[in-house]
Structure formats: C-alpha cells, structure tokens
C-alpha cells in the first residue's frame, strides 16, 4: 500500500473587464432646467426631492444620467444618508467612480485532495477525497464541495476481470446569485445605478426604525437594495449525488467476449428561495422549499465476436441488451407573505402553503446488435439494429425498431487510377433513429389545486394512440484527395425525414 498523496490548488477570481461607464453627467434628463424664479433658473440642476418652497421639481426619480455636468464647485441638495431623505444643506456635485466596483470582491477557490492507492499482481484499488471551498466575486456567495471516490479492479482469473467505481459528492451553496433582467439580480441593479450615488449610502439595507420590514431604496422602489439582494434574498441549496458502476468482463475464448455491467446515478437536491418583506415583487415576503430526488439505473449485457479470415475479411460483431429505469420526484411548497420578518419556514406563512408535486417514472428495455465487416481494407460494411420497448408509449405502440446500414469503398484499391490521385473513397448510408416521449402523455390526469380537497383537470389534449418518433436519414458522398493529400475534397449529400 503506497503512502497517501496530497495535492492542493489555490486560485483567485476577479472581474476581468468593466463596461466603460460615464462619470461626466449625473442623474437627470437634459430637460431638467431650473425654472424661472428658482435658484437654478436657466441652468441644469439636480435635486433629491422637490424644493421645500416648491420652486423646482425633483430630478432623482429617473434611472437616466443625462443631467447636470459634475462640478465640485456646484452645490445641490442631494440624498442625506443620516436622515435617509433630502439633505438640508447643499453639497458638492461629484461622481462616485467606484459605486459599482465596490460591490464586488476578489474571490478565491481552494482545493485540497488526498489520494491513496494500493496494488497487487492481480488488482488495484484507489480512494480519494477532495474538499473545495469557493468564495465568489460577490459577497455572501460561493460554495463548498466534498467529493469522495473509490475504484477497484481485480483479475479473478485469466478470463474474468471485475471493475468497480463509485463517486459521492456533497455540495452546499449558501446563496446562488440570480441572473438576468429581474429585480433580485445584481446585474439589474448595476444597470440602474447612477454615477452620483455613493454605494455606502445603501449599506444600512433597512430604513431606520423599520429594520427587516422596509428596505432602503432611496431612488426607486423598482430597484432592490443591492445588500438586501445579497444578504436577504438568498437562494441556498444542498445536493447529495452518487454515481456508481460495477462490471464483469469474461473472455470466453480468442473470438468471444462477454460483458455485464450495471450503473446508477442518483441525486437528492434541496433548494430554497428567500424573499424578505418589502421585496420588489413579493412585498410581504416569500419562502419556497423544494426537494428533488431522481435516479437512473442502467444494466447492460453484451456479447462480442471478432475474427479475421484468410481471404482478407475481418468481422467485429456484438449483440446485447439494456434495461433502463428513471425516476424523478419533486415536492415543492411555498408561502406568499411572512408573519415574522426574516424567518424562512413554511409555518411562518400568513396562509397555508401552496404545494406542488411532480412524479415521473420511466422504463426502457432494449435489444441491439452491431456488425462491422472489412474486406482487405478496401470495402467496408456496417450494420446496426435496435429495438426498444418504452413504458411511456401505449401498449400497442411501445415496441419500435430502428436499423442502419452503411457501405464505403476505397476505389483506388479496386481500380488503377492516375498516380496524382491519393484517395478516392465513396460512401452511402441509410439510418433510422427512434425516440419515445415523456411519461404520462397518453391519458389525462388530475393536477393539484391550491384549494384544499380539490383537483385541476388538465388542459392538455392527450393521445392514446401515441406513436414513437422515427426519423430516417439518407447520406451519400465521397472523399477525394490528390498530390499526396495536399489537395482534397470531402463531399456529403444528406436528406433527413
């Protein structure tokens, strides 16, 4: 048994490139000109809220930044982070050039791994465990992952070999940041952030005296506070997954082999969505919990035959079968409106949870064969066939067969061609591909309803004579090369229906 082997890796992440944001003009529109009789008469101006005497209007309600040009010598009435309202004293009109960049941080990924290997003259085993910790470029994001793997192989006899492999992964994400154009996305906030807004003004998250009830949104109720998005509107998740397989290979003789194999992929995933009170979409708060369990089990058996004959014919053929089972089970419950701010439990909802379930089960049994013939490396023939039996199709249509055949010939091995021609190979094929459908598409089923003790009739028109999808592809072409492969043309014509 060898000594454990340790390996580690550390990397840092940072924003690679920023858009060329402008910091020449502040919040406002070109039409924001001081009216007659005001202190800003005839000039571009800025005002957080309207003047106390009503002599000029507010310009802080727009996300556009085509207003007054920045000038530290000009004084405007701006936002006051102490009072969380309009300042009583005019302050210099300046830009805050880091009011987007300061929202980000330098992230890192740290990976530690230990592996142990053992060998003998008839087998080997290897085990490893890896821990990965990631802090992303946005605060309160990142993940931890633990992966344990073991693999072993043993030569039981000259003819029989056993292989086993298993991998388990646990992944925990404290918060998966939202993406795209929505109110809980930092990208959305960056679009509407104005150059005259100091990011520090938003750090308190909540209005004074209304903690956990009213988020601080000085400029627009349509844009979430970025720190509330990062620290309160969380999307945590935990996932356990396993991939395992075992196989046995039997060499019957010099021409025949037999293989049997079974493998499983399974995962258990728990996801949550937290939305605080005063969220842009869910003003009274929101909580959702979702559990997903799914697995796929595959078992195969395969006979293989290979032989060469004195006349130049080589044959490789195999025939076997597969049994596949799939299962998907999802249970989700959500509440709109929270009784106690900041408590994310289904029991904390102001009403009964809305429960949703999705269960899908599928089985597919298959028999298949493939045969490859080669004659003196100048004529090739490939033939395949597969028959599936699917549980998702009606009983009368659940069996479907799809074959393929292809032939190719190296013409310069059959005929004497000009020496300038390096290769002329022609080919043609006919192939079919079959496909079934998702579970529960042949008959109507009732769905769950928000109203207790009731169900919903599906609006989908189901087909009790659902047939498998069979697509047919025709292909022909040639590969032509000249002057020792310096010039070539590969042509293919195909038709699919």
Model-derived regions, located:
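Short glycine/threonine-rich loop-to-helix capping motif typified by GTGT followed
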Residues: 395-399
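Short, small-residue-biased leader/transition segments that mark boundaries at the very start
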Residues: 1-3
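Outer-membrane beta-barrel architecture
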Residues: 113-117, 128, 151, 245-247, ...
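Residue-level signature of outer-membrane beta-barrel architecture
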Residues: 118-120, 131, 154-155, 248-250, ...
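Transmembrane beta-barrel architecture of outer membranes
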Residues: 111, 143-149, 366, 400-404
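Outer-membrane beta-barrel initiation region
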Residues: 102-106, 116-120
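Surface-exposed loop/interface segments of Gram-negative outer-membrane beta-barrel transport/assembly proteins
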Residues: 5-95, 106, 136-141, 147, ...
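Transmembrane beta-strand segments that form the barrel wall of outer-membrane beta-barrel proteins
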Residues: 8, 129-135, 381-393
